[in-house]
From Swiss-Prot:
Entry's family note: Belongs to the NusB family.
Keyword flag Cell membrane: no
Protein name: Transcription antitermination protein NusB
UniProt keyword list: RNA-binding, Transcription, Transcription antitermination, Transcription regulation
Keyword rRNA processing: no
GO CC field: cytosol
MF (Gene Ontology): RNA binding
Superkingdom in the source lineage: Bacteria
Transmembrane region(s): none
Gene3D superfamilies: NusB-like (1.10.940.10)
Amino acid sequence: MNRKLSREKAMELLFGMTLNTDNCEETLENFIDNYESDIKELDITYIKRILIGVENNKDNIDESISKNLCNWKIDRISKVNLCILRLAVYELLHDEEIPNRVAINEALEITKKYSDEKSVSFVNGVLDNILKK
């Protein structure tokens, strides 16, 4: 199972959940039913843990993000970057299995793939601020 790919798919699913009203169970079920590659490559248990964890802790996660923004408001963050931040903040604050540096580095790699260079610096700054507290 590929944790890096699983984390990326979890972010994509979180993004999808911001665009529709499906809960994490429905989102994951639809994803599994429609996934066209080898599902064995993915850690479905990990993806489910991320989706449920972010959904259950969203207020706390968003508060942590908001407190660590410099001259920004959370509603100004692009949906993609917000989903990346939510995933990483969940791992930093609520998932002891993932080392903090891994959570940050993986978030930055996902940001490079799905966003732009300015966003990489932005995401890194927010996550570093959260880690310092």
